[in-house]
Swiss-Prot record:
InterPro entries: Ankyrin_rpt (IPR002110), Ankyrin_rpt-contain_sf (IPR036770), Cortactin-Actin_Reg (IPR050719), Cortactin-binding_p2_N (IPR019131). It is found in: Cytoplasm, Cell cortex; Cell projection, Dendritic spine. It comes from Homo sapiens. This is Cortactin-binding protein 2. The keyword Repeat applies. The modification Phosphoserine is found at residue 1524.
Length: 1663
C-alpha cells in the first residue's frame, strides 16, 4: 500500500511498482546523499522518520477498512445505469496479465498525493511564520529607536529655542549696525552726487572748448583755401614771367653771341688776316657762360634765389635750370631779395658743395645725386639733441625721388611731419636740421613762412651753401644789421604763423617766442622745400644762431615736454593736465591703500564674535571652599569645539545626575589656554551648558551627591572641553576616570578626539590610561592623529603613548595621520620614532595612505624627514624648505640627502598587488608620482595581480612623467663671448646665462632636438623682452620668431654640446640621448654672433639694447662719420661706442681694409693741442701735400663733458664737415710751424658725453655732428633696466621665470620703480645733471628669499652715488643767481643755512617719494633699514611752512598764482619773465625779515637731534632764509612735490620715528579740538604710523578761495600741534587739484615744537 501511493501521477502503461521505482531513480538523480552536510543529514533523517510514522498510521487505518473498501471498490460502483463501468469490470475480470493498469485511479495513490501536498503546504506556512516573527522583532526594535529619536528631538528643539533667543540678540545688534552703515552710505552717496555734479560741469566746459576748437579749425581751413587760391594765381603769374624771362634770356644770349661774332668779324676784317674757325659754337657758349658768372660774382655781390614752393624737377634743357644771378647792393648787405625777383628750381638737396674754386661749372652742380634715405626704423633714435616730442610716424615718410622723374604734386603734403602735437623736436640728421612743416597745411604757406624765417648769412637749413659760387660779404655793416634783419624776419614769420599755426590749439610754452612750436621731421626733409642764400660767413667765426633754427636752440630741451591739451603718452596717467589755466588732476593713486587702512581700522568693530554651535555656561575656577557664583552666565564669544567629522559619543545621551555639593581641591591648578588650538576653548571659562536647564539649581543646592551617573558626566565634560567641570569631577573620590561607554570610548579618548588639550592634560595628570582602546582597537593617540590635533598628539607622546599601536584593522597613528593629511601629526610621530613600515590587514602602508589622498607634504615627510639626533625637532621652515622644493634641481636638498625609506617600502604591494606608484599614477597625482620616482629604488615595471604596470594604469600626465623618468636634463646656456674690461661700462654685464633645461629622452631625434633648442631660444628672447613677467608656458603660444629686442634663432653663431660643436639641423650617428651620455655633456652652450663677425646680436643680449637700434647707430656712424652719444651719466655710452667701434672695425677688415681704433679719455686738462696731436698721429689729419692712405681710423673721445666742446673742437668743425683737399685748414703745431691739413674721408669720429643736455656755448658744436641722445625716459634706456633685471631673475631661477607675485619679482620691480621715480623727481626739480642712467642699477642683487640684501644694496647706492649727486646738483642750481663775489664754487664749499635746509629737504623728499615708497618689505623690517639711508631724518613740515610765516592774508592769492603756474622745465635755470616780479619781491622780503630774525633768535639756531628726542624745535625763519629767486622757486617745487598727486604720496612713507602727526580733515569745524572730542577710537601704533594717505588735515589762516572754479586739495603735510587752533573755518576738501594750501605760522612765535606721541587718539577717517 505504501509503494502504491508513491507515485502522484500514475502511468497507464506501467505497473504501480514500476512507477515507484522510477520516482526513486528520479529522486536519486535530483540529489546525492554524499554531498549533504551533517546538519542536512539530520534534518533529512527527522523528515523520513515522520514519514514512516505517518505511513504506519495510514496502514493501520486501511487494514481496518480493508474489507469494506474492497467490497465497495469491487461492487459498489456497478449499476445498470453506467455501461462504462460494466466494460471496466469485464476488462478487469478478463485480463489475466498484470501489465494492464486499472481503468480508474487507485484511491490510495490519490491519498498519497494529497498527503504530499499537505506536507509541502505545511513547510511553506512554517517558513512564512518564521519570516513574520523576524519582521515583528525588527518592528519592535524600530519602535524603540523611534522613541529614542523623539527624545533626542525634544532635546534638540529645546536647544534650538535657546539658540534662537541668542541669535535674536545678535540680529538686533546687526540691525543696529546696518542702520549706522546705511547712514554712512547715504552720506557717501551725497558726496558722490556732489562730485558727479562737478564732473558734469567740467564736461560742459570741455565740450565748449571742443566747439571753439572746431570753429577755429573751420576758420583756419577757409583762410587756407583763400591763401591757396591766391598762391595759385601767383604761381600762374610767376610761370608766365619765368617763360618770358627765359625767352628774353635766350634772345639776349643770341644777341650777345651775334655781337661777339660781329666784333670778331670786324676785327678780322680790320686786321686783314686769315684765321681758321676752330672753336665750335657750343664750346664758346659754355666758356662765355662761366665768364659771365665770374664777372657777376666779382663785380657786385650776387644772390641766387631758388623758389621754395617747387619740387625737384629735371629737364633736358639745361639752359633753363641755371640759378638767376642778380646784383645786390653791397652797402645794405640784406640777405633778402625783393619780391619781384624770381628764382629757379634747385636740382638736388645736396647740389651745393662749398669749394675754393669760384668758377663752379654747371656739370659740377648737376653731378650731385639725390641722397639715399635711411630706412625708417621701428624704434626712432633721437640723434641730434634732446627730443621732447613724440616720434614721427615712419610710414608717412616720402621715398627718395629719382633724379629723372618729377614727383606728383599731391605728394607734397606728405612731406610734412606728424608731430603737430609735440613741442620742438630736433632733427634726426646732422649736421643741421630741417624746419618742420605743419601737417594739413599747404606747402606753399609753409614755404612762405620758411623763407622769412631763414638766415641768409648762415648756411641753409640743410647745412648746404647755395648753388652760385660763394662770394665774400663786402659790406662792413652787414653784421651790425643782423639783429634788425632778424627782428624783421621774426615779425614776418609771426604774421604768417596765423595761417600756419598747428591744428591742435595748444598754448605756446611760457617764456618762449610764439613760433616755438615749429618741429622737425626725419630725413624726409632732404627733398623738402628750402631757402638758399649766397653770402657765407667764414667758418672760423661761427655766425649768430637763428632764433628758430631747430637743433640750435640756446636753451636745452627739457626732459619732460610741456603738458598740452593732449597729454604725451610717456607721462603717467595720473598726471595733472594744464587746460585753460585750470589744473585738473586725475584720481590719486593712493586710494587703494587708503581703503585698505580704513578696513583695517574697522576690523575690530566689524568682526562680531563667532557664536558657538552649542550654548555655554562659564564655570569659574574658584579656590577650595568657595561657592560657584558664575555658573549661569553665558559666554557668547567662546570658540566652538573643533570636531570635524566626528560623532558625539554615545554616552552623552544619558541623563544627568548633578551633585548638590561641589568641593575644589587645591592640587588641581587651572590650565592655561595658550596651548589650545584656535578651534579649542581659549579660556578656562569653556562651554558647558549643553545639558538640561536644571544644571544650575542642582549645582547650587546642598546635600549628598549620588555617584551613579558620574562617569557619564565625566564623558560629557571631556568631550565638550569643559575644563572646570572636569577638574571638579576628577577631585571626587571613587570616580573611575578610565570608564568606557558602550563604544569603548573613555574620557581621555573623547577629549583627544575633540582636540581639547587642557582636558587631555588634566586626565593624563590624573593618571588616566593613555593606551586605552575602544571596541575597534583605536587609542586616544589614534583618534588625535586622525583628527589632526597635533598638540594632543604631542602631549600623549610625552606621556609615553604607544606610537606603534595597531588597531583591529592594523591602522597605526601614523597611518591615520597620513590618511587624513595631517602633516604636523606626521612630523611629531616621525620625530618620536614611529615605524613607517607597519602594514594594515589589507597590506597598506603609510606611504599608500599618503599617496591615496594625494597629499604631497605628507609623502615628503615620510620619505625625507629624518629623526633628530638629540631629540630636537626640526624647525618647521627648515623641514619645509628641505623637502618642498619640487623644481630646485641641483640646489634642492633632496638632490643631496637621500630618502630615508628603503626601496622595499616604496615597492611594497597591497592585497591587489598595487604599489604606491600604481595608486598615484591611476589617480593622476603627478606630484606624488614625481616624488616616488626620485627614489632610486622605485620599480616602475612592477606588475599587479592583473599583470599591469604603473604605466598601464597611469593617466596621460603621469604617463608623460614616467616616459621622462630616464630623460636627461641638460641646461641650455647663452654665451656672448668675452666682454671687454670694466672701463667700458660693462662690469655688470654677464657672459653666460642659463635659460632653461632641455629634457632629452631615449626616443628623442635630432630633428626634435633642433626644434627644441630653437624654440627654447625664441621663448627666452620673448620672455625677457616682454612688458610683464612671462613664464615659458605663456610664451609658447606665440609663434613669432623675432622678439622685441630683435633676437631670434638666426642670431646664433655656434652651438656646443659639452665640448663638441654642433649646428641646428645637424645629425650624428647616435641619438641625442646616447650622444649626451657618451660625451658626458653637462651643458649646451649657444654662442651669439658678436662684433667679431660684424654683428651686434651678442651686444644686444649683453646690454639689452634692441638690435634694431644698435644697427641704426652703426648705420649713423658709417654714413655720417661724426657721431656723439650723450645722455645722463650711467647710460652705457662708453660701452655702446666701443662695441660699435669693434663691429665697424671687423666689417672694414672683412672688406679688405686695415682698421685701427684709437681711444682717448678727455679730462679738464685736455687741450686743443693734444687733440691736434692725436688727430695727426692717428693719420686722421693729413697734410695737403700728402696722399691719403687706405687705412681706416676709428677715434673715440670719451668723457667730453669734462671739457668745453666749443673751445676743444672749434677749429676742427669746418674740416670735419668738409673732408677733402679742397677745404683745408691751417693748424699751428707745438713747434710754432703752421701747415695745411684736411681730414681723411676714411676717419670715423665718435664721442661720449655724460650729460643730459647741452648748454651755453657748447650748442655751437651741435650742428656739426650727428647726435644720439640716450634719454632715461625713452628707448633704449627706458626698458633696458627692466629687461636686464628680468634676465637676471630668469638666470637665477635656472631658466624658470617666477610668478609676478613672487617676492623676487616684487623687489626687482621696486628697484626698477626707484630708478624711474628718482629721475622723474629730479627732472621736476630742474636738476638734469643729477639724472642717472640705468648702469648703476644693473648690479641689483637678486637673492631669492632675501629681499633685505637688495634694500642694503640700495642704501649703499643712495649714500655713495645718488645723495652726493643730488646734493651737488641742488647746490649748483641754488647758486646760479648768486652775486659774482660768491661764485658757484664758493657756494658749494660753504653753502648757506638756507641752502643746507633745501638740500636736506630735497634728499628727504626724494628718499621717501622715490626710494622707500613701494618697497615690498614689511613695515617693521623697512624701519630697520631706514636708518642706513642718509638724509631721511629731515622733517618734511619745514618745506610746507617755508615762506608762509612772512606773509599776510592778502598775499595768499599771490602765492597761489605762483604755485599754480606751469612747472618750470628742468633745463631752464632762468625763471619765466612773467613769474619774476612776484618772486623777487618775496625773496627780498624773506631776506630782510630773515636777517632780523637771525639777530633776534640767534640762541635758537641749534637743532635737537632726532635720535635723542622725538620733539623737533625749529626756527623756520632762520633755517629757510633763502637768498635767491632760484632757491625760492626750488622750494616751491619741493612744496608742490610734497603735495602733488601726480607723484606717489609722500605721506605713505615717512620717518620710521613717529615724527609726523596726522589728522583727518575737519570740514567746517572752527577748532580741531572740537573734532577730536567727537567719536574716538584707540588705534595701535601701527595705525598711527603715517601709512594712511587720508588721515590728514589742512590748516590755513588765509581765506579758502578757489581760482577759476577749481577747488583745492587738502594738504598732505603734517600739522604742528602748537598751531592746531589756527585751522580756518572755511577750509574745503576736494581731490581734483594737486596744489596745497600751506600752513601759515605767526611771526611772533619764536619756535614751533613738533611733539609727537605714539598713543594719541585720532579721529576715524570720514570716508
Amino acid at each position: 500500500m505504501a509503494t502504491d501511493g508513491a507515485s502522484c501521477e500514475p502511468d497507464l502503461s506501467r505497473a504501480p511498482e514500476d512507477a515507484a521505482g522510477a520516482a526513486a531513480e528520479a529522486a536519486k538523480k535530483e540529489f546525492d546523499v554524499d554531498t549533504l552536510s551533517k546538519s542536512e543529514l539530520r534534518m533529512l533523517l527527522s523528515v523520513m522518520e515522520g514519514e514512516l510514522e505517518a505511513r504506519d498510521l495510514v496502514i493501520e487505518a486501511l487494514r481496518a477498512r480493508r474489507k469494506e473498501v474492497f467490497i465497495q471498490e469491487r461492487y459498489g460502483r456497478f449499476n445498470l445505469n453506467d455501461p462504462f463501468l460494466a466494460l471496466q469490470r469485464d476488462y478487469e475480470a478478463g485480463a489475466g496479465d498484470k501489465e494492464k493498469k486499472p481503468v480508474c485511479t487507485n484511491p490510495l495513490s490519490i491519498l498519497e498525493a494529497v498527503m504530499a501536498h499537505c506536507k509541502k503546504m505545511q513547510e511553506r506556512m512554517s517558513a512564512q511564520l518564521a519570516a513574520a516573527e523576524s519582521r515583528q522583532k525588527k518592528l519592535e526594535m524600530e519602535k524603540l529607536q523611534l522613541q529614542a529619536l523623539e527624545q533626542e528631538h525634544k532635546k534638540l528643539a529645546a536647544r534650538l529655542e535657546e539658540e534662537r533667543g541668542k541669535n535674536k540678540q545678535v540680529v538686533l545688534m546687526l540691525v543696529k549696525e546696518c542702520k549706522q552703515l546705511s547712514g554712512k552710505v547715504i552720506e557717501e552717496a551725497q558726496k558722490l552726487e556732489d562730485v558727479m555734479a562737478k564732473l558734469e560741469e567740467e564736461k560742459k566746459k570741455t565740450n565748449e572748448l571742443e566747439e571753439e576748437l572746431s570753429a577755429e579749425k573751420r576758420r583756419s581751413t577757409e583762410m587756407e583755401a583763400q591763401m591757396e587760391k591766391q598762391l595759385s594765381e601767383f604761381d600762374t603769374e610767376r610761370e608766365q614771367l619765368r617763360a618770358k624771362l627765359n625767352r628774353e634770356e635766350a634772345h639776349t644770349t643770341d644777341l650777345k653771341e651775334e655781337i661777339d661774332k660781329m666784333r670778331k668779324m670786324i676785327e678780322q676784317l680790320k686786321r686783314g688776316s686769315d684765321s681758321k674757325p676752330s672753336l665750335s659754337l657750343p664750346r664758346k657758349t659754355k666758356d662765355r657762360r662761366l665768364v659771365s658768372i665770374s664777372v657777376g660774382t666779382e663785380g657786385t655781390v650776387t644772390r641766387s634765389v631758388a623758389c621754395q614752393t617747387d619740387l625737384v624737377t629735371e629737364n633736358a634743357d639745361h639752359m633753363k635750370k641755371l640759378p638767376l644771378t642778380m646784383p645786390v647792393k653791397p652797402s645794405t648787405g640784406s640777405p633778402l631779395v625783393s619780391a619781384n625777383a624770381k628764382g629757379s628750381v634747385c636740382t638736388s638737396a645736396t647740389m651745393a658743395r662749398p669749394g675754393i674754386d669760384r668758377q663752379a661749372s654747371y656739370g659740377d652742380l648737376i653731378g650731385a645725386s639725390v641722397p639715399a634715405f635711411p630706412p625708417p626704423s621701428a624704434n626712432k633714435i633721437e640723434e641730434n639733441g634732446p627730443s621732447t616730442g613724440s616720434t614721427p610716424d615712419p610710414t608717412s615718410s616720402t621715398p627718395p625721388l629719382p633724379s629723372n622723374a618729377a614727383p606728383p604734386t599731391a605728394q607734397t603734403p606728405g612731406i610734412a611731419p606728424q608731430n603737430s602735437q609735440a613741442p620742438p623736436m630736433h632733427s634726426l640728421h646732422s649736421p643741421c636740421a630741417n624746419t618742420s612743416l605743419h601737417p594739413g597745411l599747404n606747402p606753399r604757406i609753409q614755404a612762405a613762412r620758411f623763407r622769412f624765417q631763414g638766415n641768409a648769412n648762415d648756411p641753409d637749413q640743410n647745412g648746404n651753401t647755395t648753388q652760385s659760387p660763394p662770394s665774400r660779404d663786402v659790406s662792413p655793416t652787414s653784421r651790425d644789421n643782423l639783429v634788425a634783419k632778424q627782428l624783421a624776419r621774426n615779425t614776418v614769420t609771426q604774421a604768417l604763423s596765423r595761417f600756419t599755426s598747428p591744428q591742435a590749439g595748444a598754448p605756446s610754452r611760457p617764456g618762449v617766442p610764439p613760433t616755438g612750436d615749429v618741429g622737425t621731421h626725419p630725413p624726409v626733409g632732404r627733398t623738402s622745400l628750402k631757402t638758399h642764400g649766397v653770402a657765407r660767413v667764414d667758418r672760423g667765426n661761427p655766425p649768430p644762431i637763428p632764433p628758430k633754427k631747430p637743433g640750435l636752440s640756446q636753451t636745452p630741451s627739457p626732459p619732460h615736454p610741456q603738458l598740452k591739451v593732449i597729454i604725451d603718452s610717456s607721462r603717467a596717467s595720473n598726471t595733472g593736465a594744464k587746460v585753460d589755466n585750470k589744473t585738473v588732476a586725475s584720481t590719486p593713486s593712493s586710494l587703494p591703500q587708503g581703503n585698505r587702512v580704513i578696513n583695517e581700522e574697522n576690523l575690530p568693530k566689524s568682526s562680531s564674535p563667532q557664536l558657538p554651535p552649542k550654548p555655554s555656561i562659564d564655570l569659574t575656577v574658584a579656590p577650595a571652599g568657595c561657592a560657584v557664583s558664575a555658573l549661569a552666565t553665558s559666554q557668547v564669544g567662546a570658540w566652538p569645539a573643533a570636531t570635524p567629522g566626528l560623532n558625539q559619543p554615545a554616552c552623552s545621551d544619558s541623563s544627568l545626575v548633578i551633585p548638590t555639593t561641589i568641593a575644589f581641591c587645591s592640587s588641581i591648578n587651572p590650565v592655561s589656554a595658550s596651548s589650545c588650538r584656535p578651534g579649542a576653548s581659549d579660556s578656562l571659562l569653556v562651554t558647558a551648558s549643553g545639558w538640561s536647564p536644571s544644571l544650575t539649581p542642582l549645582l547650587m543646592s546642598g546635600g549628598p551627591a549620588p555617584l551613579a551617573g558620574r562617569p557619564t558626566l565625566l564623558q560629557q565634560a571631556a568631550a565638550q572641553g569643559n575644563v572646570t567641570l572636569l577638574s571638579m569631577l576628577l577631585n571626587e573620590e571613587g570616580l573611575d576616570i578610565n570608564y568606557s561607554c558602550e563604544d569603548g570610548h573613555s574620557a581621555l579618548y573623547s577629549a583627544a578626539k575633540n582636540g581639547h588639550t587642557d582636558c587631555v592634560r588634566l586626565l593624563l595628570s590624573a593618571e588616566a590610561q593613555v593606551n586605552a582602546a575602544d571596541k575597534n582597537g583605536f587609542t586616544p593617540l589614534c583618534a588625535a592623529a586622525a583628527q589632526g590635533h597635533f598638540e594632543c598628539v604631542e602631549l600623549l607622546i610625552s606621556y609615553d603613548a604607544n606610537i606603534n599601536h595597531a588597531a583591529d584593522g592594523g591602522q597605526t597613528p601614523l597611518y591615520l595621520a597620513c590618511k587624513n593629511g595631517n602633516k604636523e601629526c606626521i612630523k611629531l610621530l616621525l620625530e618620536a620614532g614611529t615605524n613607517r613600515s607597519v602594514k594594515t590587514t589589507d597590506g597598506w602602508t603609510p606611504v599608500h595612505a599618503a599617496v591615496d589622498t594625494g597629499n604631497v607634504d605628507s609623502l615628503k615627510l615620510l620619505m625625507y624627514h629624518r629623526i633628530p639626533a638629540h631629540g630636537n625637532s626640526f624647525n618647521e621652515e627648515e623641514s619645509e624648505s628641505s623637502v618642498f622644493d619640487l623644481d630646485g634641481g641641483e640646489e634642492s636638498p633632496e638632490g643631496i640627502s637621500k630618502p630615508v625609506v628603503p626601496a622595499d617600502l616604496i615597492n611594497h604591494a597591497n592585497r591587489e598587488g598595487w604599489t604606491a606608484a600604481h595608486i598615484a599614477a591611476s589617480k593622476g597625482f603627478k606630484n606624488c608620482l614625481e616624488i616616488l620616482c626620485r627614489h632610486g629604488g622605485l620599480e616602475p615595471e612592477r606588475r599587479d595581480k592583473c599583470n599591469r604596470t604603473v604605466h598601464d594604469v597611469a593617466t596621460d600626465d603621469c604617463k608623460h612623467l614616467l616616459e621622462n623618468l630616464n630623460a636627461l636634463k641638460i641646461p641650455l646656456r647663452i654665451s656672448v663671448g668675452e666682454i671687454e674690461p670694466s672701463n667700458y661700462g660693462s662690469d655688470d654685464l654677464e657672459c653666460e646665462n642659463t635659460i632653461c633645461a632641455l629634457n632629452i629622452r631615449k626616443q628623442t631625434s635630432w630633428d626634435d632636438f633642433s626644434k627644441a633648442v630653437s624654440q627654447a631660444l625664441t621663448n627666452h628672447f620673448q620672455a625677457i623682452s616682454s612688458d610683464g613677467w612671462w613664464s615659458l608656458e605663456d610664451v609658447t603660444c606665440n609663434n613669432t620668431t623675432d622678439s622685441n629686442i630683435g633676437l631670434s634663432a638666426r642670431s646664433i653663431r655656434s652651438i656646443t654640446l659639452g665640448n663638441v660643436p654642433w649646428s641646428v639641423g645637424q645629425s650624428f650617428a647616435q641619438s641625442p640621448w646616447d650622444f649626451m651620455r657618451k660625451n658626458k655633456a653637462e651643458h649646451i652652450t649657444v654662442l651669439l654672433s658678436g662684433p667679431q663677425e660684424g654683428c651686434l646680436s651678442s651686444v644686444t643680449y649683453a646690454s639689452m639694447i634692441p638690435l634694431q637700434m644698435m644697427q641704426n647707430y652703426l648705420r649713423l656712424v658709417e654714413q655720417y662719420h661724426n657721431v656723439i652719444f650723450h645722455g645722463p651719466e650711467g647710460s652705457l655710452q662708453d660701452y655702446i661706442v666701443h662695441q660699435l667701434a669693434l663691429c665697424l672695425k671687423h666689417r672694414q677688415m672683412a672688406a679688405g681694409f686695415s682698421c685701427e681704433i684709437v681711444r682717448a679719455e678727455v679730462d679738464a686738462g685736455f687741450s686743443k693741442e693734444q687733440l691736434l696731436d692725436l688727430f695727426i698721429s692717428s693719420a686722421c689729419l693729413i697734410p695737403v701735400k700728402q696722399s691719403p692712405s687706405k687705412k681706416k681710423i676709428i677715434i673715440i673721445l670719451e668723457n667730453l663733458e669734462k671739457s668745453s666742446l666749443s673751445e676743444l673742437l672749434r677749429d676742427f668743425l669746418a674740416p670735419l664737415e668738409n673732408r677733402s683737399t679742397e677745404s683745408p685748414c691751417t693748424f699751428q703745431k707745438g713747434n710754432g710751424l703752421s701747415e695745411c691739413y684736411y681730414f681723411h674721408e676714411n676717419c670715423f669720429l665718435m664721442g661720449t658725453i655724460a650729460k643730459a643736455c647741452l648748454q651755453g656755448s657748447d650748442l655751437l658744436v651741435q650742428q656739426h655732428f650727428r647726435w644720439v641722445q640716450l634719454r632715461w625716459d625713452g628707448e633704449p634706456m627706458q626698458g633696458l633696466l627692466q629687461r636686464f633685471l628680468r634676465r637676471k631673475v630668469v638666470n637665477k631661477f635656472k631658466g624658470q621665470a617666477p610668478s609676478p607675485c613672487d617676492p623676487v619679482c616684487k623687489i626687482v620691480d621696486w628697484a626698477l620703480s626707484v630708478w624711474r621715480q628718482l629721475n622723474s623727481c629730479l627732472a621736476r626739480l630742474g636738476t638734469p645733471e643729477a639724472l642717472l642712467g640705468p648702469k648703476y642699477f644693473l648690479s641689483c642683487p637678486v637673492v631669492p628669499g632675501h629681499a633685505q640684501v637688495t634694500v642694503k644694496w640700495m642704501s649703499k647706492l643712495w649714500n655713495g652715488v645718488i645723495a652726493p649727486r643730488v646734493q651737488e646738483a641742488i647746490l649748483s642750481r641754488a647758486s646760479v643767481k648768486r652775486q659774482p663775489g660768491f661764485g658757484q664754487t664758493t657756494a658749494k664749499r660753504h653753502p648757506s643755512q638756507g641752502q643746507q635746509a633745501v638740500v636736506k629737504a630735497a634728499l628727504s623728499i626724494l628718499l621717501n617719494k622715490a626710494v622707500l615708497h613701494g618697497c615690498p618689505l614689511p613695515r617693521a623690517e623697512l624701519d630697520q633699514h631706514t636708518a642706513d639711508f642718509k638724509g631721511g631724518s629731515f622733517p618734511l613740515s619745514i618745506v610746507s611752512s617755508y615762506n608762509t610765516c612772512n606773509k599776510k592774508k592778502g598775499e595768499s592769492g599771490a602765492w597761489r598764482k605762483v604755485n599754480t603756474s606751469p612747472r618750470r622745465k628742468s633745463g631752464r635755470f632762468s625763471l619765466p619773465t612773467w613769474n619774476k616780479p612776484d618772486l623777487s619781491t618775496e625773496g627780498m622780503k624773506n631776506k630782510t625779515i630773515s636777517q632780523l630774525n637771525c639777530n633776534r633768535n640767534a640762541s635758537l639756531s641749534k637743532q635737537k637731534s632726532l635720535e635723542n628726542d622725538l620733539s623737533l624745535t625749529l626756527n623756520l625763519d632762520q633755517r629757510l632764509s633763502l637768498g635767491s629767486d632760484d632757491e625760492a622757486d626750488l622750494v616751491k617745487e619741493l612744496q608742490s612735490m610734497c603735495s602733488s598727486k601726480s607723484e606717489s604720496d609722500i605721506s605713505k612713507i615717512a620717518d620710521s620715528r613717529d615724527d609726523l602727526r596726522m589728522f583727518d580733515s575737519s570740514g567746517n569745524n572752527p577748532v580741531l579740538s572740537a573734532t577730536i572730542n567727537n567719536l574716538r577710537m584707540p588705534v595701535s601704533q601701527k595705525e598711527v604710523s603715517p601709512l594712511s594717505s587720508h588721515q590728514t588735515t589742512e590748516c590755513s589762516n588765509s581765506k579758502s578761495k578757489t581760482e577759476l572754479g577749481v577747488s583745492r586739495v587738502k594738504s598732505f603735510l603734517p600739522v604742528p600741534r602748537s598751531k592746531v587752533t589756527q585751522c580756518s573755518q572755511n577750509t574745503k576738501r576736494s581731490s581734483s587739484s594737486s596744489n596745497t594750501r600751506q600752513i601759515e605760522i605767526n611771526n611772533n612765535s619764536k619756535e614751533v615744537n613738533w611733539n609727537l606721541h605714539k598713543n594719541e587718539h585720532l579721529e576715524k577717517p570720514n570716508k
